[in-house]
Amino acid sequence: MTVRLSEGAIESLSKGTEVNNPILQCVNIRKIDGGNGVSRFRVMMSDGLHTMSSFMLSTQLNPMAEQNQLATNCVCVLKRSVTNVLKDGRRVVVILDIEVLKSADQMPGKIGDPTPYVEGQSKAPSTAPAPTARPLQPQNGSDGSTYRPSAQSFGKKPMAAPNTPGGSSKVVPIASLNPYQSKWTIRARVTNKSAIRTWSNSRGDGKLFSMELVDESGEIRATGFNNEVDKFFSLIEQGKVFYISKGTLKIANKQFSSLKNDYEMTLNGETSIIPCEDSNDVPMLQCDFVSIADLESREKDTILDVIGVCKNAEDVARIMTKNSREVSKRNIQLIDMSGRVIQLTMWGSDAETFDGSGQPILAIKGARLSDFGGRSLSTLYSSTVMINPDIPEAYKLRGWYDKEGHALDGQSMTELRGPGGGGNTNWKTLAEVKNEHLGHGDKADYFSCIATIVYIRKENCLYQACPSKDCNKKVVDQQNGMFRCEKCDKEFPDFKYRLMLSANIADFGDNQWVTCFQDTAETLLGQNSSYLGQLKDTNEAAFDEVFQHANFNTFVFRNRVKLETYNDESRIKVTVVDAKPVDHREYSKRLIINIRKLAAQ
């Protein structure tokens, strides 16, 4: 297949003129490290006539550069882009979608003799019959036909795009927003609007509110502070559609948002928000629901969307937080078509106003997954809770529950605790765990037991880990005073010690090897990993003594058990999720209850 570059496309893209699928060659690509930890890639492109270095790869396309799919000399079709004018007048073409037609190793080199594009000094495409691009060899059995971009005229003005009521800038999709744009307007529906939150500290007082916006291309979170709260809070209505322009865009903090967008918006003094009456084609919501059964395999603290039937709802309770603030909470058991049940904790006004009668359908956008008591969910300040939503997933779930789901008890993923925090419905002896083949199913099982530490292996119990806050990857000593983390792709002058213990625990009937990670390992040893690392390096005898003192101590263990396969050999792996000292009063109460049950048989 012969490919010709789209001569004149560089000039048109620079001027913001619409170009339909131009064929370009990557002349150079350079990684730019961002101050917030997110790297960007700057690309120089050629159309055979001109080159331009002000192409930027959108962050979602970074893997193409990191995996060398997009590399120097490869030939690409630019499927979607946006040209932004920076404050200093420079133009940047942000690549939103691109496809590699010929990889770099399939190309002999640069096509033609392009020169850097300078506005106002363009040279016209050659009218000579000689081709301006070297013919590319057919691949994958193609018929040798020429690949050309769709019919286009690079000098024409772009087609008219929808404008805002003020006519200041065209409406763009949310998915195309990025910090390099200076003029843009989106038309989006408000799917969630928070209450006003206030704060007071040494730097003064303040307030904020946030909202989640959606259009047909994607979603984004917007936050307003202080003056913008006064200006916009009363105007914004959940469910309504608005034209929004001139917000500040920055990298999104994924710790507090589950929205599928690399950026988030901050309202500022120049922001304009205008109601939109023509809103029928703007979607109501974007959710990516995860089955309750699949929550077993998700990482702790993941923010996700879930939908289920309210199988049971506890009464609302009032609790005191660490900062002496009283809040409302309500625990709800959700079941879905997987037959699994999980506990959802709702907070604040959601907990107070929820009515669980009639087993309503609950859809939660942005719930946090926890491993407290097995697996459980909790709503956040930013979560959206929908009761009996008008969406296909809700109707399908209602039909299933009314027909057959109501008769299921369901297998709970959450350990249900009784009054006082000491009760637990999944107490097992170690012999029962083996006799009942816990962990042999498709999903892991959780159980609690009271057991005594018999032995802890101290060999290889400590490792040098990345010092970054959210990374625990093992580092490699570079032998030059620096330590390299492959995950973060950085070198550090220091590291942190992490624990991974292998211990043998026993009760009156059996014993079991278990694995303990950082927090539970520190509980068992009674020392933190940093101190243990110092002892290991400076005082081996004191280090050994810590392990000796840990033996024959008894704890309440909460464990995860799963049959895992290594090199075609299957074995049970038990991981300690939590370890606490025994509350002998609660333990005695439970033993008395069990004795009475046995006596009544």
Swiss-Prot record:
A zinc finger (C4-type) spans 466-488. The modification Phosphoserine is found at S370. GO terms for molecular function: damaged DNA binding; single-stranded DNA binding; single-stranded telomeric DNA binding; zinc ion binding. Residues 124-135 have a biased composition (Low complexity). Residues 184-268 bind DNA. GO terms for cellular component: DNA replication factor A complex; nucleus; PML body. Keywords: DNA replication, DNA-binding, Metal-binding, Nucleus, Phosphoprotein, Zinc, Zinc-finger. The keyword Nucleus applies. Residues 107-172 are annotated as: Disordered. InterPro entries: Euk_RPA1_DBD_C, NA-bd_OB-fold, NA-bd_OB_tRNA, Rep_factor-A_C, Rep_factor-A_N, REPA_OB_2, Rfa1. It is found in: Nucleus; Nucleus, PML body. The keyword Zinc applies. It comes from the Eukaryota. Residues 137-153 have a biased composition (Polar residues). GO terms for biological process: DNA replication; double-strand break repair via homologous recombination; heart development; meiotic cell cycle; nucleotide-excision repair; protein localization to chromosome; telomere maintenance via telomerase. Its main location: nucleus. NCBIfam families: rpa1. As part of the heterotrimeric replication protein A complex (RPA/RP-A), binds and stabilizes single-stranded DNA intermediates, that form during DNA replication or upon DNA stress. It prevents their reannealing and in parallel, recruits and activates different proteins and complexes involved in DNA metabolism. Thereby, it plays an essential role both in DNA replication and the cellular response to DNA damage. Component of the heterotrimeric canonical replication protein A complex (RPA). Belongs to the replication factor A protein 1 family. This is Replication protein A 70 kDa DNA-binding subunit. It comes from Danio rerio.
